[in-house]
Structures are given as structure tokens and as C-alpha cells.
């Protein structure tokens, strides 16, 4: 009985009960799940043994175990800085966004009608960044500051007219930023010059990257260096501190072309490295070369203001190897939190925090000088670097003994950084550590600071009404609730997005993320203080080894696209070590996710596309011909398994063997790993390296477009090339590639989510989850096959964990498109499946294992009902242009207006199924005009008058 209690979570996570599974299996003609799997997955790759994960644990037991692990982390007061700072997450934001499934379980807002809430908050984020940087346009977040700086280099390289391949990076940049830039520059053949911006900019460059303020805290006027960068035909990039910009002149005023940085200190815990939302802002003229997603303002079909993702043709899912970046998952949830922080505090609140930090830092520095210390710079915002000379080691050790972490710059200098969480007590404690006799009695007059007068900010910021309206908790609470209710997330209904694995993000998995033991540590804390995190990392690595069959694991990549880049770089390093630098051709099937070709291009590989056959498999003959044609230069094959067409390819082992015979390596995109866990191990059937989407298979929520985690796993011969880190030396092998993420272990705090999931499921539950994911997908394919053709099936007639329904014949016969069906689904309260990918004119459905039989039946009956409406169009009962599909979605404003000119009844529009009468989602806007939005690009918050127009 007690042992069975430990399995309770398996039944909680998996939607269909055992009885419901049997009903579904019977309808498909199978006796049990094992028979279904044997008939669906190629026999030669089927796992013969159980995973080495252990028994399942109850929620309570797993939480107790993880709590014990977390307590092994020593929480010291951190003065380390380097881009990571203590901050307070206002509780109204913590509870109503960060801990709220209405926000964290939503998907990237590609369907704008069901995403107006998060789109509005992301637009607030963009407006906030534009205000602080003074730039014309900002994106809706990147992965971290190091990545953002590397993307700035990439933008500069794309638009450069110079023949130069040199990039200047100030030695005063954060070391982790320099590390990531070097990693990204190397495969592109770019030369990084690290030096002094006052002396070392002497020749043509692509761009110059300067930290503002510098990593040691010094504030220097970068105007002259920016002029020099422009003189030598480069773009000027300032890596900024967002809170400092409340006090400092904006990058735009100083002449910068691009501003990047992190919004972490706006309410996002350090989390031992993440997740945090980076920002990227630039001039209007470079908007079409920007990386990442951009939220813009458009109109719906009624002419009302509506938000949408703008300029999507820049992105990897459309432009593939010509994309501006391989970025897919970003940090939407964290951008939303930081924007909410600015909304809640407003300009006066932010100014107060900035001035408090600045004053405390100045007072501390003054007392140091009075005690005889010499400072590295007397002009600073929040960071003071002290020349401690032969006292360095003694002071550093004294700090550790007092439970305080400070930064050891070198053998003769220490640095301390203040933040929102620091107070007089902490400052005076630090003064004692430095053996100063005097203490700070009270803060100085707020007009006093150590910022140069010529760099003091005079321009305003956060002037928009949204930043000046919600400063009481009541008002903020209602604003956040209004936005949440505008959207569809998993707490409303199933989100059957193919290739996205929108499974349950259980509350028990989420709880540890905000524990102080996981949320408060600085990523560069001494490793001996972080035994809890190290144990969590070790467990997770061992489990991922068991699940994948690979030998080496790196947890550093903080998104799937980063994992792709890291995995391909590992392959590149392998060929380099073997003296085969000529190997630069990457074969990629035409069905691949857009990040694949974009990532291959980023590591300097030439993309050669391989055809797919009529059954959705890689065309083996075409692959064979291209492998032979490029044999001498073949670097890799990128393959997704099961395929993006939703089938288990029978020839996967032959495909891998073919590539190996031609000297190449096989990279497996792990986007569909949810169909393999406990069933087959990639390391056993041919691939050499793969990335793992923890935000898909292992339950990290999508957060409306991030965070994610994309660790990579590889075979023994590739382990020595896994990423290392310049700050934390024992992260990764000494022979490894440079850092791909700013933090050593990526977004460490959310790894606890995957730890909890795996611990609670155990070997048995993980296998069952994959089996039921495949069962649910095949049940849906079976239920829908008479209404919509299933485009691809495997050898036995089954699909994998997702299926593609073909809309192309419907479109040619009735004019109804996959978009019309997607928008009509909104009237039924459903987010659309994946549209027109990987095949145009189709929809890809992935139910995951977490959806119950009743929800799946409801979803299927909804699609069948929509097919009946299409039949009415074909028969002439419905008009071809004025029908419930072409006009979907229908808003409550439209349905309750005095005017109704449509050739169908209001009731047909509003309540097409009976279940909607008791649980109806009302979209806040009608169908959004995408063309208008891109032709009339507007990426800042609309005026209040325009908000009022929308509400009218």
C-alpha cells in the first residue's frame, strides 16, 4: 500500500486513467500499451531494459528530499555583482505571475487573439527598455546578457559594409560576456580584440562593445570611444545596467547604435544564473536585422487596436538558415515579471531604488577612503573596486567567514556591488570586514553621488500611463488579472501544439523554484557553498545519461536553440581535433525545425537540404547521394527523432551508419524526446549528440515564450568538447569549447522542475508517460481520420506522439484555410495546433500524456464540428465568405451589438457546442490583421486614447 502511494503522482500527471487507456487501446485494436509501442516503434531501437532512474516518489517525499538537498546550499550575502544582483520580487507579482499557471503555462503568442494579455505585458517590457536606453525599438527579450552582446555582434556583422572581420570588446566588459562573444565569433571567422577602448581602437572593425558602467564599477564617458568606433566603420554597442540607466545618460544620447543588457535586477531572483530576460534595443533602421521576437500594434477585423508578434519573417521558423538568429524560446515570462516590476514601482519608485543603491555605495566608499583605502575609480553607481594589495586574501577570507561573498578581481583588488536588498546593516558589516573603524550612521543627501555630472540623466522615463496607474496592490492585482483572463493557457484548456509538448507543469514541480536556497545564490558564488546545486546537477546529469544512453552531459545551454549551437560546436571541435577543418557541410531534412539550419549557419556550416519522401521519412536515396557528393566535407547530419512529420523512421540506424561511413557525425534534435523516454535511447541507435528540451519533455513550463533549458548529451568521444566557463573553472572540461551561456549551468533554478518530475515519475512513470503520449496521439488520429486526412503514418499505420491533419483539399474546394480553422477553434475555447509546419496547409496536433480522455474527446468533437461547418460551406448552406470560420473568432462586443449583418445566427457564432454554455472563453479581440501590423510597424505602448478606443 505504501509503495503504491509513491506512485500517486504518475496517475496525477498522466491524464487518462487506466480504464480510459483501455478504452482507447480497444478502439485502436490493441490489448495493452506494450503492444501499441511494439507496433509503432522500430523493433531494432526498442529498449530491452528499464531506465536506471529508480522508483517513483510521491509529491511530498520528493519535495522533502529536494528540500534537504537545497539546504546544502549556503546562502551568503552577495556583493559579487558582475551583472547579477539581489532584488525583491513584489509579492503581488510573485503570486500572480511567477507562481500563476495562467501566466507560466501559456505558449509563445503566435496566435495573438488568445494572447493579448501577455503581448501587452511584453509590449510594456519593450517600452521600458526603449525608455531606459533611449533607442527607437527593442525586442521582447533574449536569453542572457552575454547572448545579447553576441547577437549585437551578429547584427553588426550582417549589416557591415566593411571587409574587416575584427570585433573590439572592452576589457571592462563582464568576463562571462567576453567568453560568450568569443565562442560565437570563432565559427564565423571573426577576430576578437579585447582591449582598452581609450587606446586600442585603431583600425576598421565590425563593432565595438563597451560595458556601461564597467565591470569594475567605473563610469567613463564612452562618447569618444563611440566616435572612434564610428570612425573605423563599426557599430557601437553598449552593454548597460538597467537600474543604472535610471541615473545615467542613455546609450542613444551617447551615440550608441545598439544597447544590450539584463533586466534581472528588476524583480527577478539571481537563481544561481537564471532564468533572466536580457534586452536588445537599437535604431529603427536596423529593425529588420534584429534578433528575437518583437511585439507590435495592429488592428483586428473591427478596426480595434490589437497586439501581435511583428516582423516574423526575420525569424528562424520562416527564414531558416537566412534568419537573423537561431533564437526560438527566449525569456518571455521573466520579461513579463521585469515589466510588471516597472509598472508596479513606476518612475518614482525606480528612481528611489536607484538613488538608494547609489547613495549607500557612495557612503560605503567614503568610509573606505577615510580608512586609508585607495579606490580603482572614484566615479561609480553601485560597484566599488578597492586596491587591497597584500591584504586581499585576508579580507576575502574574512568576508567568507562572516557569510559574505565579495568579488576577488585579482591578487591586489577586491570589488563589492550594492543592490536593492542591501541596507545600512550590511554596509556596516562589510566595513568591519575591511577593518574600518567608522560606520555609516545615515544615508547622505540624495543629490550627492559619485556619477560624473556630464553623465547624469536629465531625460524622463516610464512616462506612459501604464507605468503610472497601478501602484496600489489592489490596482496591480486587478490589472494582472485582466491581462491573465485575456489569454488561453493550460489552466483553461488543452494546447495541442505539435512539436511543443504542452504537458502538465505540476505545482509540486514549480514550488522549489522560489525557495530561497535555489533563488538567491549568485552564479559566481564559490562552488564549495553550492553543494545542494551540485547534487541536483549530478542527479539530473545521471538521469539524462540513463534516459538518452549518452555518456557526457552539459547543463549550460539555456534554450533548445542554444543546445543546437552547442551540439554543433562540439561536432566542429571534433573535426578540428582530427585535422579535418574542411568538414563544414551539414545535411538537414526539409522537414527540420527552423532552428536547425539557423544554428548550422551560426557554427559556420553550409546547409544542404535533404528531401523527404511521400511517407514523411528522410528520402534515403537523396540522403545517400548527398552524403556521397559531400563525403570529403561532410560535418554532420541534423535529424529529429521521431521526425517532425510525427513518425518513427524505420531506417534511423541505417541513416546514422551512412553518415558515419562518410566521416560525419549525427546531431539529433531532441524536440520529440517525449516519445522516446523509457522506450528507446538515442545513444543506442546512432546519434552522437543531441539536445534535450527540458521545457518540453521534462516539464519546465513554456512561460509564453520562455524560459527553456536545452542541455546537450553526447557520446564519449565528444565529451572533451563540452562547454566550459571562464569564471567558474570546474564547469566543463578544460579542453571544452567556450561558454554558450552567461551562467555556468544556464538557468539553474528551473532545473529543480525537471528534477522533481523525474524523481516523482521514476523509471516506470517516465516510460508510461511516453507510451500514453503515443496512445493519445494515435487515438486523436483515429477519431479525426474520417473528417481530416492524416498526412503521415508509420509502417504499421500508426503515428508517433503527434499527427498532422491535411487541410489542403479543404482549402482548394471551399477556400477555408488552416488559419480559418485555427481562429474558429478560439470560439470553442481552444488554442490552435501548430499551423502550416512542417508542411504548408496542415495542422500538427500533439496532445501529450497529460490530457484526459474527456478533454481529448471534447477537442476531437470540436474539430469534427468545425468540419461539419466546412461541409455546410461546400454544400452552399453557409456563404463562402460570410460564415463562422471566416469571421472567427467572435468577440462578446460583436455578439452583443445592435448590429448583426451575418448570414448565420449569433448563437452559431457564440455557442457552437453545448459545453460552451457553462464554460466560455471570450477573445478580447477579433481576427488580427497581420499585414497591417507589419506595414504600419508600431512597437511601443499605444497612447491612453488608443486604449480607450480599444475598450469602446
From Swiss-Prot:
Keyword Chaperone: no
Organism whose genome encodes this protein: Pelagibacter ubique (strain HTCC1062)
One GO BP annotation of this record: glycine decarboxylation via glycine cleavage system
Pfam families documented for this protein: GcvP2_C (PF21478), GDC-P (PF02347)
A single cellular component GO annotation: glycine cleavage complex
Keyword annotations: Oxidoreductase, Pyridoxal phosphate
Protein name per Swiss-Prot or TrEMBL: Glycine dehydrogenase (decarboxylating)
A Gene Ontology molecular function term of the record: glycine binding
Reactions mediated catalytically: N(6)-[(R)-lipoyl]-L-lysyl-[glycine-cleavage complex H protein] + glycine + H(+) = N(6)-[(R)-S(8)-aminomethyldihydrolipoyl]-L-lysyl-[glycine-cleavage complex H protein] + CO2
Superkingdom field: Bacteria
UniProt cross-references to SUPFAM superfamilies, sorted A to Z: PLP-dependent transferases
Subunit-structure text: The glycine cleavage system is composed of four proteins: P, T, L and H.
Amino acid at each position: 500500500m505504501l509503495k503504491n502511494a509513491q506512485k500517486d503522482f504518475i496517475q496525477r500527471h498522466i491524464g487518462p486513467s487506466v480504464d480510459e487507456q483501455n478504452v482507447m487501446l480497444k478502439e485502436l485494436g490493441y490489448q495493452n500499451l506494450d503492444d501499441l509501442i511494439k507496433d509503432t516503434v522500430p523493433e531494432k531501437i526498442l529498449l530491452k531494459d528499464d531506465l536506471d532512474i529508480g522508483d517513483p516518489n510521491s509529491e511530498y517525499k520528493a519535495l522533502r528530499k529536494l528540500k534537504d538537498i537545497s539546504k546544502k546550499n549556503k546562502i551568503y550575502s552577495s556583493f559579487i555583482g558582475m551583472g547579477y544582483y539581489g532584488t525583491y520580487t513584489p509579492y503581488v507579482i510573485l503570486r500572480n505571475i511567477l507562481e500563476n499557471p495562467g501566466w507560466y503555462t501559456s505558449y509563445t503568442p503566435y496566435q495573438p487573439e488568445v494572447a493579448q494579455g501577455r503581448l501587452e505585458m511584453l509590449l510594456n517590457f519593450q517600452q521600458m527598455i526603449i525608455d531606459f536606453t533611449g533607442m527607437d525599438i527593442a525586442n521582447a527579450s533574449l536569453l542572457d546578457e552575454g547572448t545579447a552582446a553576441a547577437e549585437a555582434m551578429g547584427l553588426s556583422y550582417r549589416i557591415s559594409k566593411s571587409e574587416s572581420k575584427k570585433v573590439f570588446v572592452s576589457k571592462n566588459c563582464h568576463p562571462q560576456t567576453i567568453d560568450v562573444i568569443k565562442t560565437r565569433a570563432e565559427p564565423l571567422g571573426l577576430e576578437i580584440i579585447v582591449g582598452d577602448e581609450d587606446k586600442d581602437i585603431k583600425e576598421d572593425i565590425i563593432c565595438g562593445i563597451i560595458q556601461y558602467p564597467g565591470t569594475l564599477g567605473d563610469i567613463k564617458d564612452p562618447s569618444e570611444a563611440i566616435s572612434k568606433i564610428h570612425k573605423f566603420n563599426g557599430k557601437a554597442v553598449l552593454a548597460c545596467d538597467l537600474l543604472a540607466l535610471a541615473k545615467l545618460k542613455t546609450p542613444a544620447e551617447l551615440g550608441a547604435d545598439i544597447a544590450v543588457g539584463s533586466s534581472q535586477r528588476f524583480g527577478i531572483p539571481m537563481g544561481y544564473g537564471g532564468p533572466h530576460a536580457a534586452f536588445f534595443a537599437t535604431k529603427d533602421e536596423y529593425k529588420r536585422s534584429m534578433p528575437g521576437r518583437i511585439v507590435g500594434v495592429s488592428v483586428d477585423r473591427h478596426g480595434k487596436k490589437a497586439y501581435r508578434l511583428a516582423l516574423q519573417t526575420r525569424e528562424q521558423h520562416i527564414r531558416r538558415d537566412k534568419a537573423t538568429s537561431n533564437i526560438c524560446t527566449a525569456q518571455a515570462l521573466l520579461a513579463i515579471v521585469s515589466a510588471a516590476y516597472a509598472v508596479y514601482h513606476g518612475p518614482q519608485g525606480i528612481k528611489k531604488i536607484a538613488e538608494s543603491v547609489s547613495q549607500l555605495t557612495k557612503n560605503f566608499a567614503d568610509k573606505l577612503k577615510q580608512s586609508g583605502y585607495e579606490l580603482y575609480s572614484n566615479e561609480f553607481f553601485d560597484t566599488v573596486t578597492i586596491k587591497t594589495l597584500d591584504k586581499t586574501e585576508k579580507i576575502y577570507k574574512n568576508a567568507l567567514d562572516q557569510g559574505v561573498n565579495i568579488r576577488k578581481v585579482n591578487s591586489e583588488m577586491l570589488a563589492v556591488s550594492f543592490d536593492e536588498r542591501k541596507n545600512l546593516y550590511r554596509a556596516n558589516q562589510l566595513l568591519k570586514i575591511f577593518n574600518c573603524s567608522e560606520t555609516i550612521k545615515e544615508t547622505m543627501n540624495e543629490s550627492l553621488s559619485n556619477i560624473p555630472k556630464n553623465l547624469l540623466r536629465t531625460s524622463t522615463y516610464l512616462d506612459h500611463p501604464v507605468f503610472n496607474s497601478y501602484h496600489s496592490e489592489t490596482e496591480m492585482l486587478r490589472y494582472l488579472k485582466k491581462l491573465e483572463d485575456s489569454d488561453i493557457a493550460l489552466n483553461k484548456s488543452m494546447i495541442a501544439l505539435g512539436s511543443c509538448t504542452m504537458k502538465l507543469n505540476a505545482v509540486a514541480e514549480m514550488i522549489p523554484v522560489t525557495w530561497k536556497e535555489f533563488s538567491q545564490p549568485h552564479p559566481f558564488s564559490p562552488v564549495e557553498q553550492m553543494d545542494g546545486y551540485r547534487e541536483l546537477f549530478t542527479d539530473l546529469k545521471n538521469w539524462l545519461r540513463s534516459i538518452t544512453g549518452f555518456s557526457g552531459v552539459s547543463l549550460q545551454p539555456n534554450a533548445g536553440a542554444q543546445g543546437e549551437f552547442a551540439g554543433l560546436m562540439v561536432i566542429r571541435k571534433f573535426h578540428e581535433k582530427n585535422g579535418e577543418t574542411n568538414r563544414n557541410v551539414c545535411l538537414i531534412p526539409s522537414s527540420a525545425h527552423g532552428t536547425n539550419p539557423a544554428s548550422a549557419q551560426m557554427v559556420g556550416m553550409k546547409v544542404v537540404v535533404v528531401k523527404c519522401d511521400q511517407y514523411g521519412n528522410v528520402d534515403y536515396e537523396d540522403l545517400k547521394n548527398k552524403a556521397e557528393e559531400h563525403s570529403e566535407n561532410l560535418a554532420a547530419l541534423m535529424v529529429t527523432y521521431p521526425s517532425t512529420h510525427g513518425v518513427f523512421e524505420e531506417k534511423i540506424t541505417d541513416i546514422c551508419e551512412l553518415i558515419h561511413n562518410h566521416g560525419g557525425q549525427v546531431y539529433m534534435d531532441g524536440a520529440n524526446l517525449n516519445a522516446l523516454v523509457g522506450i528507446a535511447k538515442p545513444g543506442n541507435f546512432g546519434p552522437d549528440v543531441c539536445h534535450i528540451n527540458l521545457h518540453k519533455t521534462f516539464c519546465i513550463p513554456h512561460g509564453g515564450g520562455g524560459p527553456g533549458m536545452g542541455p546537450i548529451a553526447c557520446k564519449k568521444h565528444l565529451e572533451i568538447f563540452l562547454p566550459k566557463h571562464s569564471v567558474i573553472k570546474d564547469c566543463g572540461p578544460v579542453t571544452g569549447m567556450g561558454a554558450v551561456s552567461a551562467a555556468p549551468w544556464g538557468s539553474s533554478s528551473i532545473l529543480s522542475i525537471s528534477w522533481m518530475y523525474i524523481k516523482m515519475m521514476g523509471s516506470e512513470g517516465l516510460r508510461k508517460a511516453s507510451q500514453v503520449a503515443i496512445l493519445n496521439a494515435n487515438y486523436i488520429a483515429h477519431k479525426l481520420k474520417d473528417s481530416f486526412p492524416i498526412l503521415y503514418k508509420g509502417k504499421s499505420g500508426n503515428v508517433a506522439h503527434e499527427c498532422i491533419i491535411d487541410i489542403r483539399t479543404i482549402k482548394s474546394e471551399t477556400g477555408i484555410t488552416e488559419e480559418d480553422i485555427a481562429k474558429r477553434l478560439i470560439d470553442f475555447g481552444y488554442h490552435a495546433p501548430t499551423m502550416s509546419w512542417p508542411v504548408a496547409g496542415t495542422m500538427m496536433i500533439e496532445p501529450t500524456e497529460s490530457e484526459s480522455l474527456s478533454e481529448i474527446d471534447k477537442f476531437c468533437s470540436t474539430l469534427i464540428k468545425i468540419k461539419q461547418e466546412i461541409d455546410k460551406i461546400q454544400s452552399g448552406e453557409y456563404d463562402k465568405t460570410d460564415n463562422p470560420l471566416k469571421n472567427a473568432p467572435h468577440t462578446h462586443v460583436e455578439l452583443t451589438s445592435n448590429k448583426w449583418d451575418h448570414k448565420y445566427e449569433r448563437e452559431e457564432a457564440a455557442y457552437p457546442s453545448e459545453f460552451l454554455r457553462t464554460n466560455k472563453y471570450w477573445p478580447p479581440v477579433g481576427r488580427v490583421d497581420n499585414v497591417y501590423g507589419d506595414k504600419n510597424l508600431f512597437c511601443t505602448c499605444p497612447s491612453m486614447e488608443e486604449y480607450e478606443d480599444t475598450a469602446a
